[in-house]
């Protein structure tokens, strides 16, 4: 009998579903690394680079290989200490981000710092998110940006999750992809990264139902990529300047879902570099989210089995303050209105803060004016006016607000 040269069905499925690598990822050349100085300085020197908030910074700088060994060790220990001491109160996305950061690579001792205990804790938090969706009209405890981080971390660190459930909840068109009826580009981008990881981790042991789920995941990914590209602006940005970094990552890992003429990567990169020179990334979270893409990296490059790459003399971290550009017309103070929803009870307030403030400043001012109403927040709904320029994306909200659980509609039980 002649031997068959046909691939097994599952092998063929694997071959057809895993996208080819893009021929060119438009990272910044080594000759232009100095253009990244403002980002590095912002991340390392910021007053918000503390505790769990440092996870975003650690992840970004590790992917870029910019930290010295001592800086890496110091920042890793800071994130680990904050994670372990506050884990019960962390949102699922915060814990996922910490796991990605401390497990992004292994240190000189050859050990990855991410523990199986943290991964199990994330599994439980993710299941709590799913349960809340089932009980509250599809609303997670946090939002889809954080749910995507959950799936990504569980996927990369061999946590437990249901492929079928992932395929079910991440359908395109789901209301959780939208913020004030506007598609959230960074939420969609994070979902693409998570779905791509799930798709690439399939094995021969998957059953027929899981194969169907994988096919759905492929279709979901393609739809989300198309939605991201639909948000492309004339100047090359994907959504806006703050969502562009993670959107670039999403497009890096999904080149088979769009044509080359649909996206000019170099145009996007050059626009981002121009924005950096104008001081667009003054917050460490924003800087951390844009840096990996400029280095040609994505969160899928996280690998707990790979040795960390440390900075060399070819890149000098500047201690100079990042450039800050003030608009021609800029009032010294702005008025911000927001409302807090706790168990369907709504508290509203209006506070005045200096122009350029972050949302954490708004909350601190509200607490000063009425500590009884605003000192403890389990859930928030943000109605943005004066700070609209500052918070363009879900990812940014996770930056200075790491100690809060921000949900799509502020519904937390």
Question: Which residues make up each language-model segment?
Answer:
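Buried hydrophobic core positions in alpha-solenoid tandem helical repeats
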Residues: 39-43, 79-83, 122, 166-174, ...
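Alpha-helical scaffold repeats of the Armadillo/HEAT/TPR superfamily
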Residues: 114-124, 209-220, 264-271, 306-319
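Extracytoplasmic low-complexity, Pro/Thr/Ser/Ala/Gly-rich segments
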Residues: 28-62, 334-342, 351-355
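Ubiquitin-like/PB1-type beta-grasp interaction modules and other compact soluble beta-rich domains
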Residues: 9-16, 124-125, 129-139, 152-155, ...
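An alpha-helical repeat/solenoid feature that recognizes helix-turn-helix modules
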Residues: 2-19, 45-69, 87-112, 134-166, ...
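Helix-turn-helix repeat elements of alpha-solenoid scaffolds
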Residues: 28-35, 68-77, 112-125, 161-165, ...
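Eukaryotic modular interaction domains in large regulatory/scaffold proteins
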Residues: 223, 227, 249-253, 268-271, ...
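N-terminal signal peptide
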Residues: 2, 12-37
């Amino acid at each position: 009998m002649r031997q068959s040269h046909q691939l097994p069905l599952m092998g063929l499925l694997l071959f057809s579903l895993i996208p080819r690598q893009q021929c060119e990822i438009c990272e910044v050349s080594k000759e232009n690394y100095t253009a990244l100085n403002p980002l590095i300085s912002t991340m390392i020197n910021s007053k918000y680079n503390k505790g769990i908030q440092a996870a975003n910074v650690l992840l970004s700088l590790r992917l870029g290989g910019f930290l010295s060994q001592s800086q890496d060790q110091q920042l890793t220990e800071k994130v680990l200490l904050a994670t372990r001491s506050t884990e019960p109160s962390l949102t699922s996305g915060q814990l996922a981000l910490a796991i990605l950061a401390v497990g992004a690579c292994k240190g000189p001792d050859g050990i990855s710092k991410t523990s199986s205990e943290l991964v199990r804790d994330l599994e439980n938090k993710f299941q709590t998110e799913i349960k809340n969706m089932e009980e509250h009209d599809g609303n997670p405890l946090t939002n889809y940006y954080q749910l995507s981080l959950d799936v990504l971390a569980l996927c990369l660190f061999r946590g437990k999750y249901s492929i079928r459930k992932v395929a079910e909840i991440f359908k395109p068109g789901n209301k959780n992809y939208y913020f004030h009826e506007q598609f959230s580009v960074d939420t969609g981008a994070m979902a693409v990264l998570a779905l791509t990881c799930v798709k690439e981790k399939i094995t021969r042991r998957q059953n027929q139902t899981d194969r169907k789920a994988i096919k759905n995941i492929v279709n979901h990914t393609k739809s989300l990529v198309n939605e991201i590209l639909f948000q492309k602006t004339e100047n090359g940005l994907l959504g806006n300047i703050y969502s562009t970094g993670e959107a670039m990552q999403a497009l890096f890992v999904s080149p088979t879902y769009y044509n080359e003429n649909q996206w000019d990567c170099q145009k996007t990169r050059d626009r981002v570099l121009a924005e950096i020179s104008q001081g667009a990334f003054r917050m460490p979270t924003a800087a951390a989210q844009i840096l990996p893409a400029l280095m040609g990296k994505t969160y899928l490059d996280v690998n707990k089995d790979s040795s960390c790459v440390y900075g060399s003399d070819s890149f000098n971290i500047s201690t100079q303050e990042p450039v800050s550009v003030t608009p021609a017309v800029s009032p010294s103070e702005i008025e911000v209105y927001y409302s807090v929803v706790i168990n369907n009870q709504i508290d509203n307030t209006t506070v005045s803060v200096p122009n350029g403030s972050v949302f954490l400043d708004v909350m601190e001012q509200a607490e000063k004016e009425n500590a009884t109403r605003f000192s403890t927040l389990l859930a928030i709904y943000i109605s943005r006016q004066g700070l609209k320029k500052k918070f363009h994306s879900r990812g940014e909200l996770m930056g200075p607000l790491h100690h809060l659980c921000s949900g799509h509609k502020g519904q937390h039980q």
